[in-house]
Amino acid sequence: MYGRIASLGLLLIVLWSTASPAQAPASIGTVDALVGDCTVVRFGESGARALAVGTALYEGDRIRTEAGARLRLAFVDGTVVQLGESTDLALDWFLHAPDAGTQNVLLRVSSGIFRVILELVLPRAAFEVQTTTAVASVRGTDWIAEATPEATAIVALEGQVAIRNIEPALPGEVVLGPGEGTTVTADAPPTAPTVWGDARRNQFIERTTVP
């Protein structure tokens, strides 16, 4: 009896010692630059951690910039996201599989101002950014948006970006070209694209530039 128990115990020790450890989640990007106080709440955690240059980013992260802060994030697919002050960004979904030609990204901004610079989109790709009122679908472009609970203002700097209301019951989509902007309120489709003046466009650029 004791011999069997000893043998079983030895077997369990061997199996435990040779078992592969749980794989750590893969990083999807890093903090490239920041000014001021910026924090992240990891998926499954409740407390915020301070961000620093080089901090790894993971799917499920919720990121915030405080008043006066700026933040630049560099992702593994070449995308760059720049946040102005008082901005909340959630990295809801991030799949980048270049060998399979697949890219599936969903970012969510509940408030604040941000810039997305998307350099490469794979053949089978879906890259979306959601705000409180709008959904932006892109296939390689440079654009800026400011989100409040009531409305989202968006301007394209390069390329094209398709914009629609986040509510499926409000149909209608506009496609912005370089220099064009639109506004999406909670209860209406996007406004017709109009060319923004230099002052308004440059203000958006300045507010999302990280020194």
Question: What are these regions, as identified by a protein language model?
Answer:
Residues M1-R4:
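Positively charged n-region of N-terminal signal peptides that target proteins for export
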Residues S7-S17:
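Bacterial N-terminal signal peptides
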Residues S20-P211:
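Flexible, surface-exposed loop/linker segments and immediately adjacent secondary-structure boundaries
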